[in-house]
Amino acid sequence: MKTFFRTVLFGSLMAVCANSYALSESEAEDMADLTAVFVFLKNDCGYQNLPNGQIRRALVFFAQQNQWDLSNYDTFDMKALGEDSYRDLSGIGIPVAKKCKALARDSLSLLAYVK
């Protein structure tokens, strides 16, 4: 869990320092990881009422904040990447309640920016 958030933070810092280029594979994986977090919150943590449109806006906001160019987004199999990320997240060996609390604390605030 810490590794995921460190990776996202590191990716964010690197993106701030770099020019905007087409979405890289690691950036697509970061997008898939964040998508998996929101899907996990909806499916496993009782946040079924999170609007899909708001989640999409949060993902775009996340990419924009990192100065990522989404023009080649469709070249990645985001469904497969997201499913892999969701499986990885589901397989983390900590109690679901603790996992839900940490994910909600660290990611739901992103939705407030795009509300």
Swiss-Prot record:
The keyword Signal applies. Keywords: Signal. It comes from the Bacteria. InterPro entries: Chap_lipoprot_PulS/OutS-like, PulS/OutS-like_sf. Residues 1-20 form the signal peptide. This is Uncharacterized protein YacC. It comes from Escherichia coli (strain K12).
